[in-house]
């Protein structure tokens, strides 16, 4: 059920995080139709230092302003670049330096959109904030739950798993009940400049640059050997940080004599020896894990893990729900899967669900090899 409109005597002030995209634009429209007093806020989270707008921040601000002008609401702007650098980007670099593959969007949601933005909006006198995320919330028994968005192709609960229930309780998600085509229809109906705007993809601060070109600006590359599982050296890599488990493209080791035609995949990143271990075939056994370890989990609301609990999990965005058993260990958490999981990647997030409820998640520390119980 959608959030009810406030009564006339309790007209609530909502500040919408306006990204310059269609989802936040339509969120503002829907809230106005529901009777809220609506304002917008555009966040600048990255400072370009070379004169090139890789993040298209100026274009996005112009689109956000055009939408706010069209629907007749005020647009605030705020610069959270310092907070982003300290709380998101430095962690991003540290993870890559340690050989892991982080997801900065998850940290950005926790530290910027649902912390810095939320605090700033409250300072401006807002009762609530709103975003264009495809998730839903439910208030039940004195707590606020985070639910999957109704559009399975757009559900973004994976990215919001580290946001606490107290923050979710102060947030409205107007498009979480809708499917994307309906959102675009609403934007077209209201003549919004963002109606046909492409969805943003990738990491904002990298933009259109090649990832390797961006990363080498901040971290020195450490070239090393590429080896097969038998220890044969078949090439060289430019740095382990440029590769991730399960990667196929960009290895530069095709056409080897006696190797067969099957493509090569990254199986292991040997950090101690700076070696990339590869193997052939999409179904290579070393690509599959049966369990994973996480040292810390952020729960939307506290849950009881005094005994192992049956849940489902995702180890990547848009993955289907994977049945698993989650248990607390002496050093963290262990999730054991019913079925083998391909390319479980340290540094990425595992997110746990109970049906449509997103319970929380944490960073994958270790992926344990799959051993067939049969």
Swiss-Prot record:
Outline the segment boundaries, as ranges, of region: Interaction with tRNA: 154-156, 316-317
Q: Where in the cell is it found?
A: Cytoplasm
What GO biological process, any one, is recorded here?
A: tRNA wobble position uridine thiolation
Catalytic activity, reaction form: S-sulfanyl-L-cysteinyl-[protein] + uridine(34) in tRNA + AH2 + ATP = 2-thiouridine(34) in tRNA + L-cysteinyl-[protein] + A + AMP + diphosphate + H(+)
Segments of this protein annotated with the region Interaction with target base in tRNA: 103-105
Q: Which residues form the active site?
A: 108, 204
Q: Which GO terms describe its molecular function?
A: ATP binding; tRNA binding; tRNA-uridine 2-sulfurtransferase activity
Keyword set, alphabetical order: ATP-binding, Cytoplasm, Disulfide bond, Nucleotide-binding, RNA-binding, Transferase, tRNA processing, tRNA-binding
Q: May I ask which residue range the UniProt record assigns to the signal sequence?
A: none
Which residues of this protein are annotated with the site description Interaction with tRNA?
133, 348
Q: Name one Pfam family in it.
A: tRNA_Me_trans
What EC class is this? Answer: transferase
Please provide, in alphabetical order, the Gene Ontology terms of the cellular component aspect for this entry. cytoplasm
HAMAP family per the UniProt record, alphabetical = tRNA_thiouridyl_MnmA
Q: Which family does it belong to?
A: Belongs to the MnmA/TRMU family.
What task does this protein carry out? Catalyzes the 2-thiolation of uridine at the wobble position (U34) of tRNA, leading to the formation of s(2)U34.
**Which PANTHER family has this protein been placed in?**
MITOCHONDRIAL TRNA-SPECIFIC 2-THIOURIDYLASE 1 (PTHR11933:SF5), TRNA 5-METHYLAMINOMETHYL-2-THIOURIDYLATE -METHYLTRANSFERASE (PTHR11933)
Q: List the protein's name.
A: tRNA-specific 2-thiouridylase MnmA
């Amino acid at each position: 059920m959608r959030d009810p409109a406030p009564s006339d005597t309790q007209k609530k002030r909502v500040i919408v995080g306006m990204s310059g995209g269609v989802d936040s634009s339509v969120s503002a429209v829907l809230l106005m139709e529901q009777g809220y007093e609506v304002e917008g806020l555009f966040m600048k989270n990255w400072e370009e230092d070379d004169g090139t707008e890789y993040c298209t921040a100026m274009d996005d601000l112009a689109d956000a302003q055009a939408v706010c002008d069209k629907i007749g609401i005020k647009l605030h702007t705020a610069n959270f670049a310092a907070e982003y650098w300290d709380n998101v980007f430095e962690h991003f670099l540290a993870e890559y330096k340690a050989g892991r593959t982080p997801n900065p969007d998850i940290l950005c949601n926790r530290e910027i959109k649902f912390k810095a933005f939320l605090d700033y909006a409250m300072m401006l006198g807002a009762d609530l904030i709103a975003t264009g995320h495809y998730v839903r919330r439910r208030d039940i028994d004195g707590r606020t739950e985070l639910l999957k968005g109704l559009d399975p192709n757009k559900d973004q609960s994976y990215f919001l798993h580290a946001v606490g229930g107290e923050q979710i309780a102060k947030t409205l998600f107007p498009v979480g009940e809708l499917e994307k085509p309906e959102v675009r229809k609403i934007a077209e109906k209201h003549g919004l400049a963002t109606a046909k705007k492409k969805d943003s993809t990738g990491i904002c601060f990298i933009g259109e640059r090649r990832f390797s070109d961006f990363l080498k600006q901040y971290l020195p590359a450490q070239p090393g050997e590429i080896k097969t599982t038998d220890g044969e050296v078949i090439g060289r890599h430019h740095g382990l940080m440029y590769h991730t488990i399960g990667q196929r493209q960009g290895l530069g080791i095709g056409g080897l004599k006696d190797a067969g035609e099957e493509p090569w995949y990254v199986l292991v990143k040997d950090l101690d020896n700076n070696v990339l271990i590869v193997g052939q075939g999409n179904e290579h056994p070393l690509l599959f894990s049966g369990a994973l370890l996480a040292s810390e989990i952020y729960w939307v609301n506290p849950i009881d893990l005094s005994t192992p609990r049956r849940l489902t999990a995702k180890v990547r965005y848009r993955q289907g729900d994977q049945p698993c058993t989650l248990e607390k260990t002496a050093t963290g958490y262990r999730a054991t899967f019913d079925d083998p999981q391909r390319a479980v990647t340290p540094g990425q997030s595992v997110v746990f669900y109970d049906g449509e409820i997103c319970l929380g998640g944490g960073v994958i520390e270790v992926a344990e090899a799959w051993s067939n119980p049969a």
